[in-house]
Amino acid sequence: MNYPTTSFPARSGAARPGEPAARAKTFPEKLGLGAGQLGLDQPPSTYRGRSPEKESAEILSIAARAGISVLDAQVSFGQAETTIGRIMPRPCPFRVTIKAGRCDRGPDYIEDEARAALRRLRLDKADAIMVQAAGDLFGQHGEAVWDRLRTLRDEGLFRAVGVSCFASDDPVGLTRRFKPDIIQAPVSLLDQRLIVSGALAEIAGMGVEVHLRSIFLQGLLFLPPDRMPTALKGASGPLSRVRRMIAEGRSDPLQAALGFALSRPEASSVIVGVASAAELQAVIAAAASPPPDLDWDEMALEDPAPLADKGWAAA
């Protein structure tokens, strides 16, 4: 999962007057929290003197109080799931999403891992289970794994089964073939490929839930010019132009990124990752503000380097 790797800057200024005030009433229903950035699957460390577990407990508490509806608990290791299960508010206030195990190990392994993940999270059932790589469904066990996941859904273990994919995975073709309940894909203010192509609208038109991830494009919009990776130097000019347009619209990068994603009519959920309680509070404040009046179409990057599906490492 690609969640932002750069701390959010301080927000600058209020929303523009005259914009719809109803935004604050609707954002929690769309906003989801990704657990992959919490650091629970990393070696023990501290954040400003606090352990990742204590920081994560506060993050989950803030999310619950704010009415954030989705907890995407697709983490790398079972220990992280165990920790989330221990610190999650009870009764669980979230619609929890978990990841499916490795498809190449077959359907029995997938089912065993799914049930084990629920035990670690201390849940009887979860909202959704996601196949992590669309290509896995075309492997030796792909069809059998998908059939097993749908069986688990029909038995009530999950409400929905879905696939996490990239723009290069042909999400529309994937949806037509496998008929998932959820498609999760990277879409952002800077990466609008699935919007421009009409893929997102077509998928939503099939009755499939669309969950947006990577809405901060790994923090690229927040990255200072002097920290731009060498491979992305060519994007410096377009990024400066986008930042200027945002500033001229009396907004800031965080509010613009969230406003764009949350206002997409195709999206059922918008998943964000945070590393601290302060970051989540900044996200909630920005999301509750009316979306800025900006020309979204003009902000999409055309340079393929920052949009590469394999991502890049922020230097």
Show which residues each predicted segment covers.
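Active-site groove signature of glycoside hydrolases
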Residues: 118-137
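N-terminal binding-site loop/beta-alpha segment at the start of enzyme catalytic domains
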Residues: 1-94
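Active-site mouth loops of central-metabolism enzymes
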Residues: 40-54, 99-108, 137-139
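Short, acidic/polar
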Residues: 48-62, 106-121, 166-173, 257
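Beta/alpha (TIM)-barrel catalytic core signal, keyed to glycine-rich beta->alpha loops juxtaposed to Asp/Glu
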Residues: 9, 13, 134-314
